[in-house]
Structure formats: structure tokens, C-alpha cells
Amino acid sequence: GSVIKIDKKKKKIKIYKKNKVKTLASYNLVKTMRAGILVLGPLIAKYKNAVTSLPGGCSIGARPVNHHLNSLKKMGMKYFIKKGYIHAKVNKTLVGNSIRLPKLSVGATENLIIASCLAKGKSTIKNCAIEPEIKDLCNFLIKAGAKIKWIGKRTVEIIGVKSLKSVSYTVMGDRIECGTFCVAAALTQGNLKIKGFNPKLINTELNLLKKVGSKIKIKKDEINIKGSHNIKCINNLKTKE
């Protein structure tokens, strides 16, 4: 139900809300991306009801949305699933609660944070995912008037407000996109300069590329990478949540 204007030259997107907003997110819209489930929290928090299709998958595989639903249920949301659609509603408004996510989930963390901004009272969300994109989302919401405070590495406290205001915000760069270009340069012995991206966001990846032989120089918002003709192997690479 929004009006969206895209300025490709200035790389800007303007979103204008219509007076009447649809609270139905159809399968044709939601199936295109995993993040489609993220419309549930905002819709139920602001408009008190929502009908949204179960989200599409991604190359990582099928991932359930039970953490989203169970957590929002603790804030007062009632729902049922019928023919692939989540039918959700809340009486009056969502109410803040203390919620511990049973598993680290970027999407569930984002949905809860957004919903809590317009809920009544205080919400404490524990065992949050802490990807840079989540911190960026919080910065955007704070600029829009939300009251968000991190009180631990994986705990966030939110005091609900009546409404959020319109703002202008620059979204952080895409870590996956930037990392992909860096790896491509390393594999093809290329010489690449990436501008407009904070190198600290992929510091771990850049350090690994240095270990395989790439020469990397970084500035405030710039990465220079030159691939090596003698790519080295990394042994015992271990990742963690």
C-alpha cells in the first residue's frame, strides 16, 4: 500500500505511506525472499492484524519461522496457519515482555525489535543475534524515535513508543556483496578497489584473504585488494556463532 520512488542516479529510495495500508502480504510477494516474514512484526504492531504467506526459501535451505511466531505470541499476538498463510491479530496492542530466543536467529531478532518499538511498556530480548545489520536496523529505528538500549552483548531493552517518525537514513553496505567481490579478486589475481564500504564489517574475511596471499590496503571507506599468483591454503579454519 505504499508509494515507492527510486532514484537510480542518486541511489536513493523514497517511501510514502498511503492513508490506507493493506495488511495482506500475498504469496506472490513473500515467496520471492526469505525476509518476507519480516512484515509480520511491523504489521501486527502498528495495524493490530496481519495475513502473511509463509516465506520463501533460500539457497541455505528451509528454515522454520516458529521462533518468530512463539516470541510474538508472548507479546499478545494470536495466530493460526491456514493454507500456507499466517493469520495474526492482537487485542488493542502488543505488550512488552521478557523474551529469550531459544536459538540465534537474525530474522526473529529483527522482527521482535521492530514489533517491540510500538508495543506497550518494556521489552527485553535475550540471546539476540548481533550481526552488523541488526545494529544498523537499531540505529535507523532510534533515529526514527525508538527507545532502544543494548544492556549486554546479546540482550536488548526496548521501551515502546506510540509512533515513529519519517527520517532519511543511509543503509550500511552489503557484507556478502563486498566479500564476494574481494574473493573474486583474490581468485583471479585481480586488482580491485571498492569504495563506499566500511572495511571493519568484513575484517575477519579480509584477514583470511591476507593469509591466502592477497595484498590488502584499507582506508576509512575503501578496500584495495590485489590477488596473489600463488594462493596459499588455510588449515583448520573454524567458524562460530
Predicted regions and their residues:
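Short, structured segments at the rim of ligand-binding sites
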Residues: 1-241
